[in-house]
From Swiss-Prot:
Gene (name only): mcsB
EC number: 2.7.14.1
InterPro entries: Arg_Kinase, ATP-guanido_PTrfase, ATP-guanido_PTrfase_AS, ATP-guanido_PTrfase_cat, Gln_synth/guanido_kin_cat_dom
Function text: Catalyzes the specific phosphorylation of arginine residues in a large number of proteins. Is part of the bacterial stress response system. Protein arginine phosphorylation has a physiologically important role and is involved in the regulation of many critical cellular processes, such as protein homeostasis, motility, competence, and stringent and stress responses, by regulating gene expression and protein activity.
Protein name: Protein-arginine kinase
Length: 363
């Protein structure tokens, strides 16, 4: 398979589109946790009940079209190869928990990959909508419409006083988890992030790494989400998160301008050194690749680097993960082989960018 063909089939729509404030906010995600009446929750249900739930959703929703999202495909975890599951995690379409710890887990995935419905994870279903940039309200509207459509076919576990019943007490109520993925290199470089994270946590929000709980903030990418849902409306949860995100955007932009003033040519040098490494390296580990990609993305946003797509960070942060590298290679790779393949893939992506620029100039 040619790189261009692999790239075009591997990249989800949200990765290659730009949304509001997409210089800092990479994506907005809404997730709704729901359970079905007459079935025990996943923490207690039997294997037979788990299979019945998968069968219910396969029978009711698989291969049906939904609006502009296209048809739903049902992916059963037991039928996927480890590399295939890893790729789904790397694209943020399923959780590591569903991939690794749910033998009767499944996922309904829309054609455009903006919608995924995890089945038999921590709850019977978890509805997820992903949008580029800062679009929490739009993502909530899309998730709510999908939720209503699903509820037209199944009965949810709902309590008049408590709201939607979920396995984890922190999700009881709306069952809503809203999150944004943010690129905050200047706040990291100026070390302001060290005081900002505890302050955000005190406001009832959670700051995590790229792949959620327990993961590292590779490439200066942070995930900010709400923690509690009981006693708050969906709109209140979104508004609270949106306010904090707007403040973070303002702080990051101010920190970037401060760095330009104080570091000047040193900052520009840092950006171009990282670009040089990515364009020419033959071996690169994931941590170094993530840091270099973050530097290059910052350079694009500051206008140092021209004619390179801003979305290169979104795309390559995912395409250079182990699952994707092995999918591109067509089989399992040892860590040192992945480092060679990662370097080659990054060089190919940058060459593709150059070809697009040349074609644009010729027109």
């Amino acid at each position: 398979m040619s790189f261009e063909k692999f790239f075009n089939t591997a990249v989800s729509a949200w990765m290659s589109q730009e949304g509001p404030d997409s210089d800092i906010v990479l994506s907005s995600r809404i997730r709704l946790a729901r359970n079905i009446v007459d079935f025990r929750f996943p923490t207690l249900f039997s294997s037979e009940e788990a299979m019945q739930i998968v069968a219910l959703f396969e029978r009711t929703f698989a291969y049906r079209s939904y609006g502009g999202a296209g048809r739903f495909e049902l992916l059963k975890m037991s039928e996927l190869q480890p590399i295939e599951k890893r790729v789904l995690v790397e694209k943020h379409l399923i959780s590591p928990h569903l991939a690794e710890d749910s033998p009767f887990g499944a996922c309904l995935l829309s054609e455009n990959e903006e919608i995924s419905i995890m089945i038999n994870e921590e709850d019977h279903i978890r509805i997820q909508c992903l949008f580029p940039g800062l679009q929490l309200a739009e993502a909530l509207e899309a998730a709510s419409e999908l939720d209503d459509w699903i509820e037209g076919h199944v009965n949810y576990a709902f309590d008049e006083r408590l709201g939607y019943l979920t396995s984890c007490p922190t999700n009881v109520g709306t069952g809503l988890r809203a999150s944004v993925m943010m690129h905050l290199p200047a706040l990291v470089l100026t070390q302001q992030i060290n005081r900002i994270i505890p302050a955000i946590n005190q406001l009832g929000l959670v700051v995590r790494g790229t792949y959620g709980e327990g993961s590292e903030a590779l490439g200066n990418i942070f995930q900010i989400s709400n923690q509690l849902t009981l006693g708050k409306s969906e709109e209140d949860i979104i508004a609270d998160l949106h306010t904090i995100v707007q403040q973070l955007i303002a702080q990051e932009r101010a920190a970037r301008q401060a760095l330009v003033k104080t570091l000047g040519i040193q900052l520009e040098d840092k950006v171009f050194r990282s670009y040089g490494i990515l364009a020419n390296c033959r071996v690169i580990e994931s941590k170094e690749a993530a840091q270099c990609l973050s530097d290059v993305r910052l350079g694009i946003d500051l206008g140092y680097i021209k004619n390179v797509s801003r979305n290169i960070l979104n795309e390559l942060m995912i395409l250079t993960q182990p699952g994707f590298l092995q999918q591109y290679a067509g089989g399992a790779l040892r860590p040192e082989e992945r480092d060679v393949r990662r370097a080659a893939l990054i060089r190919e992506r940058l060459k593709m960018e150059e070809r697009r620029k040349m074609e644009g100039d010729e027109r």
